């Protein structure tokens, strides 16, 4: 089984608690997680409960105490801004995780919440990306693929991603379609896209090229062993991408309330009931 990798500074600890909880909940053997963090945050991560192995490296020292707004106003050491430098830590993290012996790595932003087991990937898949599935005007700006949920199998791909960051139109994300083209040429059948049921973020619902009401109608109840019971067009939802703790972004809050409402319909499913109880401590009506 592949491993997981994530970045986590002080702002990500609350999200990590959800990520760890849901990885444990839906996977019989929770995967090893490789984490880039910083000295003040590492003890907080170590204190979080997780039955799998956590491998943490102090690699984010240049960004201690800084949020995105500040980093975007600060010149970077390699890229235009310090935030661009921070985003480029993702391919460096993947390179390091693969150096530790991981058999492929799935990068997850800390704010991924799983609703079922991790996706299965064939051994020939070298790169798997999650399309935003948003309207073209937003795709043109932010990129075809989301950089918060992606799989790669080799250091060569991680190095190519880092190289492409230098000319990306949107941080580490806008160049992912170029990475997909490169991988497709190098490995026949080596590139795969995750389906709509994976990495479903508020942006897929509110920024889609179809009305959000129509997209919501695709969601339904479909009880299946080992899954939460939420489905899109008869396929179980694997994960959503959201900050459950957020209080100052209406789009995210509306998405969270809607998802939690759907999950509450499924408390007859034991694991889903556990998830609802966990999330209800976080999300306030």
Segments predicted by a language model, with ranges:
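N-terminal anchoring/stem segment of glycosyltransferases
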Residues: 1-76, 99-101, 259, 267-285
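Short, solvent-exposed loop/turn segments at secondary-structure junctions
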Residues: 11-12, 40-41, 61-62, 112-114, ...
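Conserved glycosyltransferase catalytic-site signature
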Residues: 16, 91, 172-176
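Short, charged, surface-exposed secondary-structure boundary motifs
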Residues: 16-17, 21, 63-70, 136-145, ...
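Extracytoplasmic beta-rich repeat domains
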Residues: 82-83
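GT-A fold catalytic core of metal-dependent nucleotide-sugar glycosyltransferases
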Residues: 86-140, 144, 151, 155
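Residues that flank catalytic or metal-binding motifs in active/ligand-binding sites
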Residues: 108, 145-148, 172, 236
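Catalytic core and acceptor-binding pocket of nucleotide-sugar-dependent glycosyltransferases
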Residues: 155-255
